[in-house]
């Protein structure tokens, strides 16, 4: 007999069940590359929700970068020799939402998320993904350091079932990245919930316009946040918007944190800042 706690269903043999209407996907950290995306697909359409749209698909990674192919991608990108579809993969950012007709566009090259003709389908797939995230109590929206603290003496399974944390509020703050105005992002950054503050900081990192004076002041103050995950993302936001010295000071300090999750988070942030973070090289090499 199949144990009650197993969620899988037979798809072959005498006891096979009805086919699923939807399948779900996720994209999270791999090695040093941090990311967060979720997806849902039915027989016709694939919907992808990118919660870190300021990060491209083709992020630098130590192991793949040892080969020649990635460097060819970098060269073609630098020389602006990519077509639109290639740039979607190789470029520095991603759309917040992606929608593809998998039957007519099996390579997923034509993003329909902004097409008026597909508004109903987009809404349907968006709702289905939200429903799935709620039902599964998806913990992927927690920064890793906070997750490890929460899991001490327990497990992710137990935390999710217990409803000890407000996953809805955290997920809402993540959904604000790339979407919300300053008022909403500031409210997130100044929340009593450190997990919401984390996403508030990322929201300012992803913001394309120049920081307002109010936002910059709030971020300056947040460099002293009690959470290292928040401090790192606040420093990232400030550095990306031109306030380098205090941001690097904070990031370099986190390289000495006793928790290696924090250290790798800070190191990756410094790496992606590129030449802006040149002053941090000695600390990275130490």
Which sequence ranges carry the predicted segments?
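Proline- and acidic/polar-enriched loop/turn elements at helix boundaries
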Residues: 7-8, 52, 145
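Alpha-helix N-cap/helix-initiation sites
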Residues: 4, 73-75, 212
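A generic secondary-structure signal for well-formed alpha-helical elements
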Residues: 1-3, 15-19, 44, 49, ...
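Leucine-rich solenoid repeat scaffolds
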Residues: 281-286
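C-terminal, low-complexity/hydrophilic appendages and adjacent surface loops
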Residues: 30-114, 120-121, 149
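Long, internal low-complexity/basic segments
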Residues: 81-96, 102-104, 112-261, 268-278
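Polar, surface-exposed loop/tail segments
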Residues: 1-42, 111, 118-127
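Short Asp/Glu-rich motifs
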Residues: 14, 59, 152
């Amino acid at each position: 007999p199949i144990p009650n706690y197993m969620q899988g269903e037979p798809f072959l043999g005498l006891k096979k069940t009805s086919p699923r209407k939807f399948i779900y996907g996720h994209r999270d950290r791999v090695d040093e590359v941090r990311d967060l995306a979720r997806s849902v697909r039915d027989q016709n359409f694939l919907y992808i929700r990118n919660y870190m749209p300021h990060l491209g698909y083709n992020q630098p990674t130590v192991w793949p970068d040892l080969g020649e192919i990635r460097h060819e991608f970098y060269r073609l990108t630098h020389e602006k020799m990519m077509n639109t579809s290639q740039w979607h993969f190789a470029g520095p950012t991603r759309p917040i939402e992606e929608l593809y007709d998998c039957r007519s566009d099996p390579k997923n090259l034509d993003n329909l998320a902004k097409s008026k003709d597909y508004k109903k389908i987009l809404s349907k797939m968006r709702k289905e993904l939200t429903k799935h995230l709620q039902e599964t109590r998806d913990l992927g929206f927690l920064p890793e350091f906070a997750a490890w603290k929460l899991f001490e003496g327990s497990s992710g399974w137990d935390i999710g079932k217990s409803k000890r944390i407000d996953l809805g509020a955290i997920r809402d703050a993540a959904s604000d990245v790339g979407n919300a105005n300053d008022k909403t992002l500031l409210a997130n950054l100044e929340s009593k919930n450190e997990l919401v503050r984390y996403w508030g900081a990322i929201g300012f990192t992803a913001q394309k316009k120049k920081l307002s004076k109010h936002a910059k002041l709030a971020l300056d103050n947040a460099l002293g946040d009690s959470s290292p995950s928040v401090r790192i993302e606040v420093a990232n936001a400030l550095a990306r918007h031109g306030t380098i010295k205090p941001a690097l000071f904070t990031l370099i300090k986190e390289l000495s944190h006793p928790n290696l999750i924090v250290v790798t988070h800070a190191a990756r942030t410094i790496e992606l800042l590129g030449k802006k973070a040149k002053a941090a090289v000695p600390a990275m090499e130490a």
